Regions:
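N-terminal signal peptide c-region/cleavage motif recognized by signal peptidases
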Residues: 19-21
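All-alpha RGS (Regulator of G-protein Signaling) helical domain and cognate RGS-like helical scaffolds
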Residues: 25-203
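Bacterial N-terminal signal peptides that target proteins for export
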Residues: 1-10
Length: 203
C-alpha cells in the first residue's frame, strides 16, 4: 500500500466526515464489545446492555458501508451498481441518526461516524481491503465492491442474529423494529448484489 493510496483514501474520509483526527478522544477501546464509557443500565430499564452495544457497533458498521458506497461514485461506471450504492448511502446515514438518537434518549454514549475506523465488527473490511477498493476502477472495482458489500451486509445480519440470541435483548420496541428492518433491507440488497456480481464479465 503506497503513501499516495493511503493519503487519497484518508482525504476522501476526512472530506466526507468519516475520519477525524480527534476520534480517539471518544474513548474507543478498539474491541468488538464496547466503545466509550462503561455501559450502565438503570434498574427497570426496557433495554439491555446488548441493545446498547448493538446500536453503538452498528453505527460504526453503517459508517463503513457509507464510505464504501461513496467510493463507487468515482470508481465505477456501472449504472445498476451506482443506483444501489446511492441507495445504501442515502438510507444508512438516516439510520445512523436513528441509532444515535436512541442512545442519547437513554443517556448512553453515541459514537460519531468516524468510529468505524476504531472497531472491526462482523463483515467489516480491513484497511488493506479498502485501499485496494480505492485503487481499483471499472469492473475490477465493481467486483471488489460487490464481494465486499455482500460480506459487509451479511455481517450486519449476523449482528442482529447475535442481538436476538442475547437474553432479554431486542425486545425494546424501537430496537426490535430497527433490527428487523436492517435484516429485511440488507437481505434484499444482498440478493441484488449477487445478481449484479453474476452479470460482471468473467475474469
Amino acid at each position: 500500500m503506497t503513501a499516495r493510496r493511503i493519503s487519497s483514501l484518508v482525504a476522501l474520509l476526512v472530506a466526507t466526515g468519516f475520519a477525524s483526527p480527534v476520534s480517539a478522544q471518544h474513548g474507543m477501546d478498539h474491541s468488538m464489545h464496547r466503545m466509550g464509557p462503561e455501559i450502565v443500565i438503570p434498574k427497570g430499564a426496557l433495554y439491555t446492555k446488548a441493545d446498547v452495544e448493538f446500536m453503538q457497533m452498528m453505527i460504526a458498521h453503517h459508517a463503513q458501508a457509507i464510505v464504501m458506497a461513496k467510493l463507487a461514485e468515482s470508481n465505477s461506471t456501472n449504472a445498476q451498481l451506482l443506483k444501489l450504492s446511492r441507495k445504501i448511502d442515502q438510507s444508512q446515514m438516516p439510520e445512523i441518526q436513528i441509532m444515535q438518537d436512541w442512545l442519547r434518549r437513554y443517556n448512553q454514549f453515541a459514537p460519531d461516524t468516524a468510529s468505524w475506523h476504531d472497531v472491526r465488527m462482523e463483515g467489516m473490511l480491513t484497511d488493506q481491503e479498502l485501499a485496494e477498493m480505492n485503487k481499483a476502477r471499472g469492473v475490477q472495482f465493481d467486483r471488489l465492491f460487490l464481494v465486499g458489500m455482500i460480506k459487509h451486509h451479511a455481517g450486519a445480519i449476523k449482528m442482529v442474529d447475535d442481538l436476538f440470541k442475547s437474553p432479554g435483548a431486542g425486545q425494546e420496541v424501537d430496537t426490535n423494529v430497527f433490527a428487523n428492518d436492517v435484516v429485511a433491507a440488507q437481505t434484499a440488497e444482498i440478493g441484488i448484489m449477487k445478481r449484479l456480481l453474476a452479470q460482471l464479465p468473467k475474469q
